[in-house]
């Protein structure tokens, strides 16, 4: 088994490291001290991450994404987290949901939901879970997708 990272992973690691060094790190402490959470959301970073291809790293190529592996996204996430963990989590949610959409949606559903996500350079995604039970198991999860 080869434990070396691929050329693509090296490329994306470099992109993420440069992004964290040049974009995130210079502003991270100041942004973290903003009192209101809604003012702290790094919309400018999200746009720049889109320009760099980071935001759509998990989106299938046929929809304009990089369609990278989970391991590649982990490598990129680690580099982003070195700059700001909160921002890395925002990107991670985008990647996680893109893989879920690819794997769990029908082609018609993919066509309805993935292109609008790719087209909006500030679009982010999240997964929220709620259970009526005190303990949540995977069989209890029911999902609905809402396009706003």
Where are these regions (language model features)?
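Short, cationic motifs built from Arg/Lys/His that form the positively charged side of catalytic pockets
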Residues: 13, 17, 109-110
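N-terminal glycine-rich anion-binding loops that anchor highly charged ligand groups
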Residues: 15-24, 47-52
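Intrinsic disorder at enzyme termini
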Residues: 1-11
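A short, surface-exposed helix-loop junction/capping segment
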Residues: 26-28
């Amino acid at each position: 088994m080869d434990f070396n990272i691929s050329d693509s992973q090296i490329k994306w690691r470099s992109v993420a490291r440069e992004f964290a060094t040049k974009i995130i790190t210079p502003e991270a402490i100041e942004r973290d001290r903003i009192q209101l959470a809604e003012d702290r959301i790094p919309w400018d970073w999200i746009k720049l991450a889109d320009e760099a291809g980071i935001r759509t790293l998990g989106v299938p190529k046929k929809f304009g994404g990089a369609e990278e592996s989970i391991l590649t996204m982990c490598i990129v996430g680690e580099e982003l987290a070195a700059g700001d963990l909160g921002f890395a989590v925002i990107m991670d949610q985008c990647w996680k949901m893109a893989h879920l959409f690819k794997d769990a949606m029908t082609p018609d559903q993919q066509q309805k939901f993935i292109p609008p996500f790719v087209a909006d350079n500030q679009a982010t995604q999240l997964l929220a879970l709620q259970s009526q039970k005190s303990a949540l198991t995977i069989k209890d999860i029911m999902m609905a997708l809402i396009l706003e």
